[in-house]
């Protein structure tokens, strides 16, 4: 089997697939070579073993603890990658993965007091790190608060019995769950909150709220992982974008990233991590004003030529694209 793209050089075989919740599955993979990764990182997956379609998924397993490399995936109605992984991929199939990526990890944090906050599928890197801390920092004081819609939506439900965890459910609450959502009162009740390293993963509004609240409560060590946002509808006014090849003009609202502008107008672009790390969305800007929040993977020569990472490019005016 030929490697579909140099970005995904790791071939892994599906050993088994486990359904976690009504819409989430864990795919357990065998890698016949040593695959280096850190708890909390993610990898790109070549969807249908193609070079054009790559998607980023958290590696939900834990190095030095888990028997398999695992990806835990929520099926999304229009998700190209998630539909393929949860409907079509079967035991014995092969997947191609990239090197592990991302800095959302706990192994470089020197402190031994953690508060891990997760919502929905954002629990995947949290569980990876929770296992790692139990194995490598058994002395660490680790608190976990996990928010779900219903008790049936708890991912890794059996495994959470091994660790102290506060479960919060919005609906259909049963014994062992707190009803509602995460509140400031719940956060304030965490012992020694201000001295903890707080790490969170989940939908963007959830993480933004968490950041605001924990910082107001005195937390200084705060880290969050980005989850992806849906593609917006195409705009008819705002910033103007002129693409030279093929020739076309389109618009996007002020404040959007270049990637959001491209995707909302159905301009072909490969995007995987959406966090300025993987380099998939490299795009050349011919003219126009913009700022960038990441240039990882770009060489000095590429930057000088006008290349940007579309996910990390913030147009300040009209742009002309190659």
UniProtKB/Swiss-Prot annotation:
A UniProt-annotated Pfam family: NAD_binding_1
Spans annotated as Oxidoreductase: 111-213
Listed GO MF terms: 2 iron, 2 sulfur cluster binding; flavin adenine dinucleotide binding; metal ion binding; oxidoreductase activity; oxidoreductase activity, acting on NAD(P)H
Gene3D superfamilies: 3.10.20.30, Nucleotide-binding domain of ferredoxin-NADP reductase (FNR) module, Translation factors
Keywords: 2Fe-2S, Electron transport, FAD, Flavoprotein, Iron, Iron-sulfur, Metal-binding, NAD, Oxidoreductase, Transport
Domain called FAD-binding FR-type: residue spans: 7-107
Span of domain 2Fe-2S ferredoxin-type: 237-322
Cofactors that this protein relies on: [2Fe-2S] cluster; FAD
Alphabetized SUPFAM superfamilies for the sequence: 2Fe-2S ferredoxin-like (SSF54292), Ferredoxin reductase-like, C-terminal NADP-linked domain (SSF52343), Riboflavin synthase domain-like (SSF63380)
Record text on cofactor binding: Binds 1 [2Fe-2S] cluster.
Domain of life: Bacteria
Coiled coil: none
Binding-site list for [2Fe-2S] cluster: 273, 278, 281, 311
Enzyme Commission identifier(s): 1.-.-.-
PANTHER family attached to this UniProt entry: NADH OXIDOREDUCTASE HCR (PTHR47354:SF6)
Record function comment: NADH oxidoreductase acting in concert with HCP.
Family from the record: In the N-terminal section; belongs to the FAD-binding oxidoreductase type 6 family.
Protein name: NADH oxidoreductase HCR
Organism: Escherichia coli (strain K12)
């Amino acid at each position: 089997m030929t490697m579909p793209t140099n970005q995904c050089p790791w071939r892994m075989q599906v050993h088994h697939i486990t359904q976690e919740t009504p819409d989430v599955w864990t795919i357990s993979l065998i890698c016949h070579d040593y695959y280096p990764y850190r708890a909390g990182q993610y990898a790109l997956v070549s969807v249908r073993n193609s070079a054009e379609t790559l998607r980023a998924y958290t590696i939900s397993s834990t190095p030095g603890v888990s028997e398999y490399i695992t990806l835990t995936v929520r099926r999304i109605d229009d998700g190209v990658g998630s539909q393929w992984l949860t409907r079509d991929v079967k035991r014995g199939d092969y997947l191609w993965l990239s090197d592990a990526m991302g800095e959302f990890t706990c192994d470089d944090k020197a402190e031994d007091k953690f508060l891990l906050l997760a919502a929905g599928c954002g629990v995947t890197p949290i569980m990876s790190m929770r296992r790692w801390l139990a194995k490598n920092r058994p002395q660490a004081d680790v608190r976990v608060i996990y928010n779900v819609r219903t008790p049936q939506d708890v991912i890794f439900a059996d495994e959470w019995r091994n660790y102290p965890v506060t479960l919060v459910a919005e609906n259909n609450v049963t014994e062992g769950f707190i009803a509602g959502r995460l509140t400031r009162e719940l956060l304030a009740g965490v012992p020694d909150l201000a001295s903890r390293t707080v790490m969170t993963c989940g939908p963007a509004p959830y993480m933004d709220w968490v950041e605001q609240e924990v910082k107001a409560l005195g937390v200084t060590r705060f880290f969050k992982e980005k989850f992806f946002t849906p593609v917006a509808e195409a705009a008819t006014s705002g910033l103007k974008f002129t693409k030279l090849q093929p020739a076309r003009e389109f618009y996007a609202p002020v404040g959007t990233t270049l990637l959001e502008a491209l995707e909302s107008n159905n301009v072909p672009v490969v995007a995987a991590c959406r966090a300025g790390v993987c380099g998939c969305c490299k795009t050349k800007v011919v003219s126009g004003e913009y700022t960038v929040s990441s240039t990882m993977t770009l060489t000095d020569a590429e930057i000088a030529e006008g290349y940007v990472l579309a996910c990390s490019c913030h147009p300040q005016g009209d742009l002309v694209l190659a």
